[in-house]
Amino acid sequence: MTATLTVALPKGRLLEPALALFRHAGYEPAEPATTRKLLVPSSDGVLAFLFVKPADVAVYVESGAADAGIAGTDVLREAAADVLEPLALGFGACRMVVASPEETPFPSLPGGATPRVATKYPRLTRAFFAEMGLGVEIITVAGSVEVAPLLDLSHWIVDLVDTGRTLRENRLVERARILDVGAVVVVNRASHKLKLERHQELLKALQDAKTLGRKSAPGTTGDLAS
């Protein structure tokens, strides 16, 4: 049986709560999440689950390679993805913030020096500081952002925060909030028109699972950040 919808799911922190939601909605992957396969059908053959890096969900869905997916709003805003966002899922909640060592001034440096900002989100970071009227040097890193000020790579960082534990462990303090982040369902615009009934069925099942079963589904409070 050919799957009617291909759904891109992000590897990492969001995968467990995303799979729990789909299971509660009645879509069980035919193979365990530990499989090395990147494309796995649901047990009933209705869906095909595509496991990709979080930042790639928007790429696959926007291009039409996947009909739908689950993504954090952080990667969607960074990519400026042209996709539909019909359903917020209520997990993966955190915030994107500016942080720095307590002794490092913010929002300006002594002598008018240009601040260096380390981040995985260069577009959003640039836009935030441009709105403040502040010129900064963006240093794009793929991970371990919190260590950048400790090694004098940057003065400030922009990253995701939930409890703030990781900031405290690295002697950083939150300076400004850029945006609130959470997991959402994303849908390709053309696919939504061409496969409207299938998308409506899936969205209703996910909405019902979110509303009625989220408390009993394991891992549905998973976070994007710490």
Q: What is each PLM-predicted segment?
A:
Residues 1-226:
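Domain-level signature for soluble enzymes in the chorismate/prephenate branch of the shikimate pathway
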